[in-house]
Amino acid sequence: MKLVFATNNQHKLDEVRKITAGYAEIISLSDIDCHDDIPETADTLEGNALLKARYIKEKFGYDCFADDTGLEVEVLNNAPGVYSARYAGTEHDSEANMNKLLSEMNHKENRKARFRTVIALVLDGKEYTFDGIVNGSITTEKRGDSGFGYDPIFMPDTYTQTFAEMGNDTKNQISHRAKAVMKLTSFLSDYNC
């Protein structure tokens, strides 16, 4: 089975391809010659994921899945949430986003946070959603060099390393995206039977 993954983020694409190996052939947006800036105008993770998956299905005709991920910090009323990628005002500026969040968390005792990913799948005319959550906390400083986004400041519960310190192999087994993708692959495995 071939599915388009509606992302331009090479890190996400690589992570998802590793997890779905053997379940589906994942095709990128560039593979279908899509260079569109797909709108993410919904106010929920589910809404944004569905917007992207529907866009590809309607415009290009491919079965597709898309994701949206948010970092939800308890003491900040679950911000940055759906606005995680543009929290500091500039789209996809991870350093600025982390710096803003660390500044807002300065002197906060409650550092509980969670990463949440929602995957929306449009397949054979039907829509499905799958979610994955990792609970953890925000560190007081950036730690580690691997990963992307907020990985250097997010430490999952029961671990002493941030996502950026633990390396991709470990992260790909426990991450929010991995959990959502595992639900997707389980669904596809049953669907293909």
UniProtKB/Swiss-Prot annotation:
Keywords recorded for this protein, A-Z: Hydrolase, Magnesium, Metal-binding, Nucleotide metabolism, Nucleotide-binding
Sequence positions that bind Mg(2+): 68
List of catalytic residues: 68 (proton acceptor)
UniProt-annotated binding residues for substrate: 7-12, 69, 148-151, 171, 176-177
GO-annotated biological processes: nucleotide metabolic process; purine nucleoside triphosphate catabolic process
Residues in coiled coil: none
Cofactor: Mg(2+)
GO molecular function, one term: dITP diphosphatase activity
Signal sequence annotation: none
UniProt cross-references to Pfam families, sorted A to Z: Ham1p_like
InterPro entries given in the database record: dITP/XTP_pyrophosphatase, ITPase-like_fam, RdgB/HAM1
Record's GO cellular component terms: cytosol
Cofactor, how bound (note): Binds 1 Mg(2+) ion per subunit.
EC annotation from Swiss-Prot or TrEMBL: 3.6.1.66
Assembly with partners or alone: Homodimer.
Task performed by this protein: Pyrophosphatase that catalyzes the hydrolysis of nucleoside triphosphates to their monophosphate derivatives, with a high preference for the non-canonical purine nucleotides XTP (xanthosine triphosphate), dITP (deoxyinosine triphosphate) and ITP. Seems to function as a house-cleaning enzyme that removes non-canonical purine nucleotides from the nucleotide pool, thus preventing their incorporation into DNA/RNA and avoiding chromosomal lesions.
Family that this chain belongs to: Belongs to the HAM1 NTPase family.
Record's protein name: dITP/XTP pyrophosphatase
Organism the protein comes from: Parabacteroides distasonis (strain ATCC 8503 / DSM 20701 / CIP 104284 / JCM 5825 / NCTC 11152)
